Amino acid sequence: MEYNFTTIEKKWQKFWKDNQSFKTVSKPTDKKYYVLEMFPYPSGKMHMGHVSNYTIADSIARYYKLLGYDILHPMGWDAFGMPAENAAIEHKTHPAEWTLKNIANMKDQLNLLGYSYDWDREVTTCLPDYYKWGQWFILKMYEKGLLYRKGGDVNWCDHCNTVLANEQVTPEGTCWRCDGEVTKKKLEQWYIKVTDYAEQLDADLKLLEGYWPDNVIAMQKNWIGRSVGAYINFNLDDGKAFPIFTTRPDTIYGVTYMAIAWNYDGLLDMCTTEQKSAVEEFIKKSAKIDQKTDYEKEGVFTGRYVVNPFNGEKAPLYAANFVLAEYGSGAVMAVPAHDQRDFEFAKKYNIPVKVVIQNADNSLKAENMTEAYTEDGTVVNSDILNGLSSRDAIKRAIEYATEKGFGKEKVQYKLRDWLISRQRYWGNPLPFVHCEKCGVVPVPESELPITLPMDIEFTVGDNPLKKSESFVNTTCPKCGGKARRETDTMDTFTCSSWYYARYTDAHNNQMPFDPSAANAWLGVDQYIGGIEHACMHLLYSRFWYKFMRDIGLVKGDEPFNRLLTQGMVLANSYESRELKKFYTQEQMNNKEYEKDGIKKEDIIVKMEKMSKSKANGIDPAEIIELFGADAVRIFVMFVAPPEKDKEWSDEGVKGSSRFLNRIWNLFLKYKDEEAFKNGKSFDYNNLSKEGQKLFRKYNKTIKKVTIDIKDRFHFNTAIAALMELLNDMSVIKLANNDDYAMFKEVIRGYLILLNPIAPHMTEELYQILNFGKMILEERWVEHDEQYCKDDTFELVFQVNGKIRDRVEADVNISEDDAKAQALASEKVKAFTDGKNIVKVVYVKGKLVNIVVK
């Protein structure tokens, strides 16, 4: 019987769909498991990165189902966003039409892989039944004082024609989505006050240690940026207060200048008349840089001085492009001797350097310094702090400032409030109106959802919503007068920050979800997605969960109990640097580079993340058609551990296909043998030696596969163990009825062990071989520890360190017997006869080495 994967896979996919095989129970038992992968943006085409991510999740879900858990494994669509709007402009189609068509296409593609999704719980963020509740949450945040509107400098992408949050600007100063240049622009924007939760977000990372990757925790910790220091009230030379935040009050006597952010509110009012125009020019220049990038640190003197409260000294005040207006007070004290950035700035503008922390050999002198001394040491030239260690001086300086009333200890965070305004159409509308009489007024909950208008003209440029009179013109909910609807839509991360909770009660039209349903399933037991979301989606989701907790919708403190960040899928890229052109694998095979006048040796070959731009993407649908879904699933799970990058290889997926064919052919070989069909039970003691050996190997394989999956999700080593077992199964000669019954049990267990990864073929074989239930209804096989220990082992015989024979020996063999067997071996004697035996060495459980001359 031929292994026709196309027919088999279609059969089981139809069966699972028709029988609602993966429908979630409404009320799980205590034995529940919620596995979730980050839902995709519906671009219309699935890529191998999706396949890798979703196969990991599906294998985990199927494994836990076999363990007897109630499973929640849903799927949905992160469906708002700019690509749909850009497609509307390009293809003259509405974003909704484009998006829903893409969803249908991607859903069909996902189903080709046999994933165990409960499609009854599908959510689509661009549909009103979902985004209504996003608006509801925003109103609740507004009520609690967590949502506000303010003007200020924002990150602006001209290409996308919208605002970007700080997290959406790359370290290179470009847009995270389009790689376009990011500039500064002044706008009135909506913000969520995530800083109110900074302390919790930081402290609760401890709850995730051991369950989330260390690097993700470190990235979030750094992004939140908790630092303990002091607020010190300096004064301007006219007596006005000038507070600064510092983490190094031990260096306060070393301040030789002060720096204030170039975009500090009221900066120009601080400047002297003589310096105002210079500062204005500097502000214009600074607006063009991105403080995330590596740029030249510059400043300009404001004409003003600031008085140090510790010693009364005056320090010049500079406007500087490296100071963040949003951090601390927007101004910093500069200590050039002990901060490298301050040192470089001081050297550039000829500002004095004053040593106040001395090293161990007392050798620091300001005039000899070529770089700042940033280590701890002993405080000098600092009056009340002299002689103290740096750490003790920090405490003493804070105590002194507190006693004198010009300072206090302060915990500061780098985390900024979440800017959620977007000047685009295809997003969730903000539920507010602007009334000339009443100002900004929230829309009543009874009027939700505020739906997007359909009479929209899509052009490159300004926000299309502003041009829709039917949308913009409305009445004020407060006074009934004329009002204009808010035309900013929300950052799409507001949609993805709570979707995991909606899955627990996906069709509730009275509230976002029933708390009892949410608390039965949450937190998510296993969340899977890319590390690129560490400081955006994952941080925002943690904030949103805490907010939902605080308004009584969920219990607990964290949404995701365990996180796996899967590796990328890589493939060879082929680039002509000369032409700045990438070739596909097929074009390379056809030598199309020759038509461009390029030699093969001039093509740069790199293993890189699959992408359209690098022309190295692989279409999963094509591979499934060639080799089947199970072969693709096995390849992506076998090629590397889930957290590591996976290198695509045509040979690799062919190898997975051969593996499945071997299983198919071997297992069906016994289908019609009477001893196999009649095999029911067996006695281990009646098994042949080969049979006993295979049964022990089977039990050891169960143990290894279970540990590899449950403890580490290392499906790659689990598959390797199953391949080893298959090799042993392929060569055994079954000697009696007990052997056949044992072999039948091994086949049954083998199919269950492989089922989470290759569900179609294993289920088909399970039925053909008449094992009764479907695997879907079975339970995971368990090993018997007594059969995980070998009765025998392979004893190696060496002569002068070279292997000359191997025998099977009893595990309890004595040293004398082992040596005697070695000396009696005919293969050994061929190398020892006629020679002088110097010594015989026995290494217990491994080998005998005979040394001869």
From Swiss-Prot:
- Give me the residues that bind ATP, please: 612
InterPro entries of this UniProt entry? aa-tRNA-synth_I_CS, aa-tRNA-synth_Ia, Leu-tRNA-ligase, Leu_tRNA-synth_edit, M/V/L/I-tRNA-synth_anticd-bd, Methionyl/Leucyl_tRNA_Synth, Rossmann-like_a/b/a_fold, tRNAsynth_Ia_anticodon-bd
What are the annotated GO cellular component locations?
Answer: cytosol
Which keywords describe this protein according to UniProt? Aminoacyl-tRNA synthetase, ATP-binding, Cytoplasm, Ligase, Nucleotide-binding, Protein biosynthesis
User: What's the catalysed reaction?
Assistant: tRNA(Leu) + L-leucine + ATP = L-leucyl-tRNA(Leu) + AMP + diphosphate
Compartments in which it is found: Cytoplasm
Q: Which GO terms describe its molecular function?
A: aminoacyl-tRNA deacylase activity; ATP binding; leucine-tRNA ligase activity
- List the EC numbers from the record: 6.1.1.4
Q: Which GO terms describe its biological process?
A: leucyl-tRNA aminoacylation
On whether Ligase is a keyword of this UniProt record, the answer is yes
Q: Where is this motif: 'KMSKS' region?
A: 609-613
An example Pfam family from this entry, by short name, is: tRNA-synt_1
Renumbered ranges of motif 'HIGH' region = 40-50
Entry superkingdom: Bacteria
Indicate the family of this protein: Belongs to the class-I aminoacyl-tRNA synthetase family.
| Listed HAMAP family | Leu_tRNA_synth_B
Q: What is this protein called?
A: Leucine--tRNA ligase
**Species name:** Brachyspira hyodysenteriae (strain ATCC 49526 / WA1)
